[in-house]
Amino acid sequence: MSEIKVGENESLENALRRFKKKCARAGVLSEVRKREHYEKPSVKKKKKSEAARKRKFK
């Protein structure tokens, strides 16, 4: 879990902006979207190979 320490003179908006940036860098939101619904292992494997194919032909 991402944590930030809020300074004494720091506004809530600045602290929230730093927290959101830290979460984005840690990949929290993408992980949540990925785990939102169960995905069968065969589907995961298929998506992974499709992504590799797209990267290869790009």
Swiss-Prot record:
Residues 32-42 have a biased composition (Basic and acidic residues). Residues 43-58 have a biased composition (Basic residues). Pfam families: Ribosomal_S21. GO terms for molecular function: structural constituent of ribosome. Coiled coil: none annotated. One of its GO terms (biological process) is translation. It comes from the Bacteria. Residues 32-58 are annotated as: Disordered. Keywords: Ribonucleoprotein, Ribosomal protein. Disulfide bonds: none annotated. GO terms for cellular component: ribonucleoprotein complex; ribosome. NCBIfam families: S21p. Belongs to the bacterial ribosomal protein bS21 family. This is Small ribosomal subunit protein bS21.
